[in-house]
Amino acid sequence: MKFFAVFALCVASVSAANLDAIAKPGFPAGRIINGHEADKGEAPFIVSLKAGKGHFCGGSIIAENWVLTAGHCLIFDEFEIVAGLHSRNDESDVQIRKVTGKHQQIVHEKYGGGVGPNDIGLIYVDKPFNLNALTRDGTAAVAKVNLPTGKYESTGKGKLYGWGLDNSGFSPNILNTLDVDIIGYEECKNALNSDDPLDPVNICSYTAGAIDGACNGDSGGPMVRITPDGTELVGIVSWGYQPCASTTMPSVYTWTSAFDKWIEDSIKNYAQLL
């Protein structure tokens, strides 16, 4: 029987013994299968969303006051945004911003909750991120990622980033990354079942027959493409088939290019309320 679930919380590998336990709708651990440690400073735009002491979603800095994430991640009234985090054991270069209520959060008005289209949200931070700060070794601690301009294709070779559990079930200290093949809506639709909740506002990562093309990344985390003009945020981790360890189905992302006007209008409208 097939089940859908929104990617959640972390990057993990699940043993065969655990498959039955997670084969149900919900928010199981997301994962980067066959990934590797990212270089320090490789993804200065990624943030960790934390409630209490726990990481629950990823996100991306798109401006000094704004973070872009998945709509399904915005479930808490209060949480922290941790930027500049590379190693869990070293927070010397991080910038922490507090979210104190729903007034700082914008979820797309057509997102219906759970698995489905329009899974996108914005977070406003009162204290801007310092985008000019450098780490002790001279790398950029925190930076924004570019939104797609339309100059470059959203499909092709891409990269994912995220934290979470490793193959042994322990939390890795270092940010993880994975190279992926990004495909468009039509190709993804052909690879999924006809009744799957895929929409033209989605793109996917997929390598036919490969498990590492499924269930990747932190919910809300970035899928990017490296262009001659810099790194572009082309997708936001949204949902995929469960159980992850046995599926070769595509992973599904919110396609950021489909929401460029929504992002622009939401930021402008929010500014009028300040």
UniProtKB/Swiss-Prot annotation:
GO terms for cellular component: extracellular region. InterPro entries: Peptidase_S1, Peptidase_S1_PA, Peptidase_S1_PA_chymotrypsin, Peptidase_S1A, Trypsin_dom, TRYPSIN_HIS, TRYPSIN_SER. CDD domains: Tryp_SPc. GO terms for biological process: proteolysis. Induction: By blood meal. It is found in: Secreted. PROSITE patterns: TRYPSIN_DOM (PS50240), TRYPSIN_HIS (PS00134), TRYPSIN_SER (PS00135). Expressed in the midgut. Belongs to the peptidase S1 family. This is Lectizyme. The lineage of its organism: Eukaryota, Metazoa, Ecdysozoa, Arthropoda, Hexapoda.
